Design a protein with these regions (language model features):
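Conserved structured catalytic cores and adjacent interaction surfaces
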Residues: 109-113
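Short amphipathic alpha-helix segments
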Residues: 141-160, 179
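Long, charge-dense
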Residues: 117-135
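Positively charged, aromatic-enriched nucleic acid-contacting surfaces
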Residues: 74-91
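Short glycine-/aliphatic-rich beta-strand segments at the starts of folded cytosolic domains
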Residues: 129-144, 171
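C-terminal regulatory domains involved in ligand/effector binding and gene-expression control
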Residues: 1-77, 181
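Glycine- and acidic-rich phosphate- and metal-coordinating loops
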Residues: 92-102
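Terminal, non-globular segments
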Residues: 173-180
Length: 181
């Protein structure tokens, strides 16, 4: 059976206000750690005037690249709770930045954990989350007489055959050297 996983197809943005502090969660699908880091830098530039730009990302089939940052918030109050949301939702290949504009009222550690978690949940709710299936891409080249054999092999793989997409290009005619003038 082919493995399925959840990922973000289209990113989104969610926002909450907690005791006058504004939390903006921006979520984006990523395929590599480099894409995740570029997205984080993009958000830091966009929200350069914010007090904090905390982030989380999880990339890879086995979450090979998973990181989070509190960006100056008390240790464990922003990045880790955001990571817990991603892990709890079982979403792969995703990056998120939660930007905080401080409203003048301290939230305490529990308040920060709840605010960062809730804002990321809002960001995910505004995103399009889909289920994908791990698979392979392959190209098979054959002459016309081999097409039936290839189709037969794919049908024997059932029920996985529903995951195969085929494309056939049939050319007719013959090749001949170009006439020289």
């Amino acid at each position: 059976m082919l493995e399925k996983y959840k990922t973000v197809y289209e990113g989104g943005e969610g926002e909450i206000v907690e005791k006058k502090s504004r939390f903006i969660a921006t979520v984006r699908p990523v395929q590599t750690e480099e894409e995740a880091l570029a997205f984080i830098e993009e958000m830091k530039k966009k929200y350069w005037d914010a007090r904090h730009n905390c982030y989380v990302y999880s990339v890879g089939k086995n979450r090979e690249y998973t990181r989070c940052s509190d960006d100056g918030e008390p240790s464990g109050t922003a990045g880790r709770p955001m990571l817990d949301v991603i892990l709890g939702e079982d979403i792969y290949n995703v990056a998120a930045v939660v930007t905080r504009y401080f409203g003048g009222i301290l939230l305490g550690t529990g308040g920060l954990v709840r605010a960062y978690s809730r804002s990321l949940q809002e960001g995910l709710a505004a995103s399009t989350v889909i289920e994908k299936t791990y698979g392979i891409s392959m190209e098979v080249v054959t002459d016309y007489t081999g097409i039936g054999k290839i189709q037969s092999v794919f049908c024997k793989i059932s029920p996985a055959s529903q995951y195969f997409r085929s494309m056939f290009c049939i050319f007719s005619g013959s090749e001949s050297p170009a006439a020289s003038s």
